Amino acid sequence: MYIFYIKYIKMGHLILIRHGQSEWNLQNKFTGWVDVELSPQGKLEACKAGELIKELNFKIDYFFCSYQKRSIDTLKLILNTIREKDDQIIKAWELNERHYGALTGLNKDEMKKKLGEEQVHIFRRSWDTPPEPLSKNSPYHPLNIETYKDIPREKVPDTESL
């Protein structure tokens, strides 16, 4: 039997922040991997998040972010608020939002009417039931979005891949 005793452990903090409201959030559209701008409200939300972090007086060692503009812009607004440089951002496409496949760009309420509220909920929240794949010809497909040009083609999803 082993007993380990550690007298002093200084625990760190993990801060998780979702991006501020995007233009497509405002329009109630399935966004997923499409690169959309923050809305004015989203920019305010990011600055408020920065103020909260500033009040907590955390020293932050690493900043991780998805490839998505709305997330990067949210983080940059936070960093500006807490007076940190934005050259410390580590981007990883694996942190991107859920991919909504063929639902991308469609209105959520209209899809609830068409597919039923329960089915839309399943597509939005389940781990094992992805929406139909997005056509590779769609302008919303990640293969057709400049942001994702560096991701190996075989890793670019057509729909959610949790």
Regions found by a protein language model. Give the residues of each.
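Short, Lys/Arg-enriched N-terminal segments with co-localized hydrophobic residues
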Residues: 1-10
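Short non-domain terminal segments
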Residues: 1-2, 28, 56, 62
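Extreme N-terminal starter segment of soluble prokaryotic enzymes
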Residues: 11-15
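Active-site beta-alpha turn of Rossmann-fold NAD(P)-dependent dehydrogenases/reductases
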Residues: 18
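Glycine-rich N-terminal loop/short-helix segment of MobA-like nucleotidyltransferase
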Residues: 21-36
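Short catalytic helix/loop segments, enriched in acidic residues and glycine
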Residues: 32-48
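Phosphate-coordination/substrate-recognition cap region in phosphate-metabolizing enzymes
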Residues: 47-160
